[in-house]
């Protein structure tokens, strides 16, 4: 899950004072001459920044902030949220949560052009905002023309709605199947993993074919990518055999597509046809090899956490999955297809999600809301928080309200829903309560679900405990594990 994903919504009109009124303070590696602020790391990856506080004067809804910049020798960040910074930081007045929206990253060399930060402030008026210009964890030189800095209201992206009246039909074996509960499997699952998850009560495992996750410009060697995929499919053969033995189903998850992501965090194949063609070909390969396994394959999970942050791209997150689904159906007419929504398959993206005009498709959502709670302390992101927190309105009913776009989508299209991921970091106060609230709602709605993740990274592993990543230790039984096992065994279902 990308913790900084921001969901776009409608905008309200407001204005902003002139750039000349902004008082910029210079930090590490920052200098100013006239209207030009320069950040120069002198070849080191220690970054640098300039900061300002601005008053948005009660702006709401969508905003667009712009500034002109020029870069030289800006290094490639090792995380998608590092690199060139044109970023806002403010506290959401409604929830109290901190927000860090930022512009798309640029690297290398580029001449003067406009950086654009587009985000949704929400319906509650926002006042003071911290603005950062700079470089984070990369080397290079960047110049900002602060006389060009501007903030304005912005009508945010509206994705086209298709197949508005379509009702999804399912074969009897899917339509009448009881609710399935399970977990994301480790990267290299063993028979012991499958057996243990089944003993806990798991009925479904999400098999992730993943590498170089969220790494920029990864998976560009197509021959090597296909060779890697073949190895993952060889392991899948074994996983399916173990799943049959222990009475489980497997969701086949292509976790990283060819081409990976660009430096703006958007999937490369949305604008690179060679990557898109290989993506579709990979699903054709999978369908040819595994068709006829409907008894054990829950579904083909087309694309993990699609991320499209521009409205106009040659191949949208939706069309990319449509092309893959159509290619699969020409080969395998029986296996269920699992489709994901934009913005990391988050619940708010279902406001504009459209169904495929295709039967036997299950729609997946990932639940990490509020992300400042679920991902606190992950890569230094977000301060400590607790669950529930009535002062912020964080409780079970808040989760219900955030899932409302998904429940509405399901009703509108008679669609089945699969929660492919949900979790809270091990050291979060009240994580067991958060998990139980989520599971209670998923069971109420009758949605299949997979906890993230079983016997994987220790931050999500329910057998680890500690107050930070450094102090986490495997202790076996934890309150989170008890909640998960109770949920897997349906003890909380009504």
Walk through the language-model features, giving the residues of each.
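Aromatic- and acidic-residue-enriched segments that line the glycan-binding/catalytic groove
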Residues: 223-227, 260-278, 355-362, 379-380, ...
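Aromatic-rich peripheral "rim/lid" segments of glycoside hydrolase catalytic domains that contact
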Residues: 159-165, 429-494
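Extracellular and organelle-lumenal recognition/adhesion modules and their flexible linkers in secreted
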Residues: 13-15, 20-168
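Bacterial N-terminal signal peptides
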Residues: 5-15
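N-terminal carbohydrate-binding accessory modules
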Residues: 154-219, 223-226
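Active-site region of glycoside hydrolase catalytic domains
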Residues: 273-393, 398-424, 444-450
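Acidic-and-aromatic substrate-binding clefts and catalytic sites of carbohydrate-active enzymes
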Residues: 108, 183-193, 212-215, 227-230, ...
